[in-house]
Curated annotation (Swiss-Prot):
SUPFAM superfamilies: alpha/beta-Hydrolases. This is Linear gramicidin dehydrogenase LgrE. InterPro entries: AB_hydrolase_fold, TEII, Thioesterase. It comes from Brevibacillus parabrevis. Belongs to the thioesterase family. The gene is lgrE. GO terms for biological process: antibiotic biosynthetic process; lipid biosynthetic process. Keywords: Antibiotic biosynthesis, NADP, Oxidoreductase. Its EC number is 1.1.-.-. In the final step of gramicidin biosynthesis, reduces the pentadecapeptide-aldehyde intermediate, that is released from the terminal module of the non-ribosomal peptide synthetase LgrD, to the final product ethanolamine-containing gramicidin. The keyword Cell membrane does not apply. GO terms for molecular function: oxidoreductase activity.
Length: 263
């Protein structure tokens, strides 16, 4: 769909950019998700970590805006919107589709502007150079697409649990199809690894994303790499939130101390 100019503020849902925030954590949601899933993080992480939930169009407060089906266009316009906020240390967290978006955004920022995040957290998605573990469904007719969504593990189960959600699901169908198009049509291009630290996080009970899928992220950084596997399925970022936030906080602490030392 054709894109129009959007105010940079529309891309961020109540970002926590206070004076105390020494590092901004831009957080990217999964397919079919929205920035609101990260609001609780703002209360649970220390004030030195400014959680900035990124809101893609076609959902929540941007429901009436056209959604993306081309990742390269999304990345270019997302970079332009976030650039004014990248004047202090920042990090990326992305879950599932969000991990892919944040990875390509980090590469774009490096190539076009010579800037990089201090750290990147890739959660619940196989490394980008690996083939998609599932069969593509974005091109299927609505009924088959919905059937595919029910069998795949990448969409919140709550959408399918009762008939009351059926009307909502029909409304969300174009956005869901667009998100899956982004993921399933992605073509990895070989480049130099990122120069920032990278943490890969997966769920032990995720039927599609294995330890090997997460370990393969190591290829994409020339800096430090660590991997964590948490209990839970694909949506462990909700069920294991406390443990996940502990990993994020402990990882970013070293950057906070360093930044304070500069001042």
């Amino acid at each position: 769909m054709q894109k129009t100019h959007v105010s940079p503020s529309r891309w961020l849902l109540s970002p926590k950019m206070t004076a105390e925030a020494e590092v901004l954590l831009f957080s990217f949601h999964y397919a079919g998700g929205h920035a609101g899933i990260y609001r609780e993080w703002q209360k649970k992480l220390p004030v030195q970590i400014g959680v900035c939930p990124v809101q893609l169009p076609g959902r929540s407060n941007r429901f009436m805006e056209p959604y993306y089906t081309d990742l390269s266009v999304m990345i270019r316009e997302l970079a332009e919107a976030l650039l004014p906020h990248l004047n202090r240390p920042f990090a990326f967290f992305g879950h599932s589709m969000g991990a892919l978006v944040s990875f390509e955004l980090a590469r774009y920022l490096r190539n076009q502007y010579g800037i990089k995040p201090r750290h990147m957290f890739a959660s619940g998605r196989h490394a980008p150079h690996l083939p998609d573990p599932g069969e593509a469904i974005h091109h299927l007719p609505d009924a088959e697409f919905l059937k595919g969504l029910r069998t795949l593990n990448g969409t919140p189960k709550e959408l399918f649990e009762n008939e009351e959600n059926e009307e909502i699901l029909q409304m969300l169908l174009p956005m869901l199809r667009a998100d899956f198009t982004i993921c399933e049509q992605y073509q990895y291009q070989e480049e130099e690894p990122l120069g920032c630290g990278l943490t890969a996080i997966g769920g032990w009970q995720d039927p599609d994303i294995t330890v090997a899928h997460m370990e393969a992220w190591r290829k994409h950084t020339s800096a430090s790499f660590q991997m964590h596997m948490l209990q839970g399925d694909h949506f462990f970022l909700h069920s294991e939130q406390e443990q996940l936030l502990a990993i994020i906080e402990s990882t970013l602490q070293s950057y906070l101390v360093g930044y304070r030392g500069i001042g």
